[in-house]
Structures are given as structure tokens and as C-alpha cells.
């Protein structure tokens, strides 16, 4: 009996990480599994329908269509746009949720009967709360809710990217734009040259 299938007889919790998730690598993994990639692509397509009323606004930020190739051909990456600078959140927020959904589906294929032995708890750190909600929807078999959660992830990402661009937030190497600092004076946050 594998560790994953042993969870069918044991209480367990599901936890979902936030922005520090190496989401591009995780999305690449699921993109090369045709079965998982097709399911996640279906959720993304369903989210397109949810977002149709705001499609034009998303197009002004170049995120009306996510640059995700699911499934991806052998040797190719899932995310067809390079690191996007201030627009990275428009890709990373939904990209993380897509990777988390793919991981959940992979757990079921590895032997976890998530329908008959559901998690005793769900926890999400930061944007991991979106992972919690898409997991709950998926476990309940509510594909429409899963699409709505994914659409929300896309809107949050687009909004974060827009605010980052408007604020002309400086980029520091590989550091993320998704940082919130409170209670610290501007003088401490301003680079001194």
C-alpha cells in the first residue's frame, strides 16, 4: 500500500501555499500529463465563459487569454510567456491555482479516494485560500464553482498586475512584485544610492 492510498483510512488535511510556490515548474509537470492537463484546461476554458463580460478589460492587460499550453508538447513549457515583470501576478495567481488543482487531481490518480475520505481540514496561506476553494469545489463535483474560483484568481492577478504597473513598482532581480508591507515608513523602504 502506498503512502497516498494509506490516507484513505487516515484523517488528513490539505494545505495550499501562496505566492512563494514554484508554480511554473508545477504547471509544467501537469502540462505533460495529458489527462490532468485536459481537466485543468477544461476549468480554464469554463473560466473564460465566466469572465466574458470583462473580457475587453482583461485584453487591455494582455491577459484575456492565459498563455498556458495544456497539454504541452514534449520538451515545451506550459507557460508560453517569459517572466512578465510587473504583469507576473496576472499569470502567477491563476497559474498557482491551476497547479494546485492539478496536484489534487494527481493525488486522486495516485490512490487517494478524496470523495469517500474527504480531508478533515483545508488550510491556505495567502493566495492558498483560492486553492482551498477550488479543492472544495472539485471534491464536491461542482465544476461551475471551480470555474468561478479560477475566474476569481484571474481577476485578482489582473488587478494586482494593474496596481503594480500604476504604482511603477521597481523590480529587484528575481524578487516578486506580490509583496505587501504595512506600518513601515517610506524612508525605510526607499532605496538609498
Residue map of PLM features:
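Short, well-structured alpha-helical patches and their helix-loop capping segments
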Residues: 95, 99, 123-124, 144, ...
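Glycine-rich nucleophile elbow surrounding the catalytic serine of serine-hydrolase chemistry
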Residues: 124-134
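Conserved residues at beta->alpha junctions
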Residues: 17, 126, 183
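Helix-rich "cap/lid" substructures immediately adjacent to catalytic or cofactor-binding pockets
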Residues: 2-123
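Alpha-helix C-terminal capping segments
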Residues: 106, 110, 133-138
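Alpha/beta catalytic cores of group-transfer enzymes, especially the acyltransferase/condensing modules
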Residues: 134-193
Amino acid at each position: 500500500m502506498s503512502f497516498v492510498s494509506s490516507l484513505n483510512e487516515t484523517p488528513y488535511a490539505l494545505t495550499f501555499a501562496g505566492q512563494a510556490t514554484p508554480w511554473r515548474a508545477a504547471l509544467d509537470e501537469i502540462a505533460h500529463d495529458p489527462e490532468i492537463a485536459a481537466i485543468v484546461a477544461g476549468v480554464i476554458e469554463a473560466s473564460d465563459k465566466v469572465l466574458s463580460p470583462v473580457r475587453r478589460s482583461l485584453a487591455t492587460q494582455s491577459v484575456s487569454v492565459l498563455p498556458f499550453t495544456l497539454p504541452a508538447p514534449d520538451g515545451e513549457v506550459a507557460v508560453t510567456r517569459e517572466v512578465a515583470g510587473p504583469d507576473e501576478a496576472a499569470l502567477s495567481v491563476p497559474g498557482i491555482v491551476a497547479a494546485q488543482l492539478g496536484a489534487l487531481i494527481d493525488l486522486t490518480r495516485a490512490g487517494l479516494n478524496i470523495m469517500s475520505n474527504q480531508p478533515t481540514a483545508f488550510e491556505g496561506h495567502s493566495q492558498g485560500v483560492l486553492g482551498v476553494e477550488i479543492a472544495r469545489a472539485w471534491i464536491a463535483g461542482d465544476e461551475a464553482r471551480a470555474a468561478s474560483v479560477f475566474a476569481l484568481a484571474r481577476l485578482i492577478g489582473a488587478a494586482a498586475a494593474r496596481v503594480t504597473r500604476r504604482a511603477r513598482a521597481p523590480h529587484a532581480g528575481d524578487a516578486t512584485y506580490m509583496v505587501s508591507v504595512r506600518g513601515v515608513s517610506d524612508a525605510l523602504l526607499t532605496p538609498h544610492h
